[in-house]
Amino acid sequence: MAGPRPVVLSGPSGAGKSTLLKKLFQEHSSIFGFSVSHTTRNPRPGEEDGKDYYFVTREMMQRDIAAGDFIEHAEFSGNLYGTSKEAVRAVQAMNRICVLDVDLQGVRSIKKTDLCPIYIFVQPPSLDVLEQRLRLRNTETEESLAKRLAAARTDMESSKEPGLFDLVIINDDLDKAYATLKQALSEEIKKAQGTGHA
C-alpha cells in the first residue's frame, strides 16, 4: 500500500497507551487517524458511539466476523472487541497514518493480513506500577483487576518473542516514552507531511 504505514500499538491496560496516543494526536492531529474499534460492552460514562468505540450487539458483531469483515477480534471479560477492515480503510482514505490499539491476540491476527504495519508494544516498568495505575483509575473490581494483571503478565512475556514487535517502549517516564514513540514513527510522519498535510 502506498503512503505511510499503519501503526499497531499494543500493551497491557494501564501501560499508558492512551496517554501516549493523546499526545501524538495533539501534536500531529492532521497526520494520525484512529481506527475506531467495535465492542459489545456497554459504554462507560462519557464514551461516545463512533468516537471511542462502535457499540454493537453480539449478534451483529458475530455476523460481521463470520463474513470476514474484521482484521482482528478478541473476547475479554465476556465482551467482544475488534477492528473492522472498514474502520482502517476510512482512516487511509483520509491519507492518514492509521493507529490500531489492539491486544496481543489482535497483533497475531494482523500478522496474518496484508496490512504490513509498524508493531509497537508499550509496557509499564513493572507489574507493581501497573497495579497502582489501575487502582488509581478506580474502574476495576478486584476480580477484573486480577484478570487484567494476569493478562498483563502474559503480554509482557510474549512481547519478548523475536519478530513479534518492531519496538518495545517501557513507559516509566512519559516524556521519554513519547520521544521514543515519535522517533520510531518519524519516517512515516515525514511521508504523511509530504502528502500535503501541515
Curated annotation (Swiss-Prot):
GO molecular function: ATP binding; guanylate kinase activity
Enzyme class, broadest EC rank: transferase
CDD domains listed in its UniProt record: GMPK
Record GO cellular component, one term: mitochondrion
EC nos: 2.7.4.8
Catalytic activity: GMP + ATP = GDP + ADP
InterPro entries in UniProt: GK/Ca_channel_bsu, Guanylate_kin-like_dom, Guanylate_kinase, Guanylate_kinase_CS, P-loop_NTPase
Pfam families reported in the protein's UniProt record: Guanylate_kin (PF00625)
Keyword NAD: no
Domain Guanylate kinase-like: 4-186
SUPFAM superfamilies on file: P-loop containing nucleoside triphosphate hydrolases (SSF52540)
Main location: other
Tissues expressed in: Widely expressed. In retina is expressed in inner segment, outer nuclear layer, outer plexiform layer, inner plexiform layer, and ganglion cell layer (at protein level).
NCBIfam families in the cross-refs: guanyl_kin (TIGR03263)
Biological function: Catalyzes the phosphorylation of GMP to GDP. Essential enzyme for recycling GMP and indirectly, cyclic GMP (cGMP). Involved in the cGMP metabolism in photoreceptors.
Family: Belongs to the guanylate kinase family.
Name recorded for this polypeptide: Guanylate kinase
Species this protein is from: Mus musculus (Mouse)
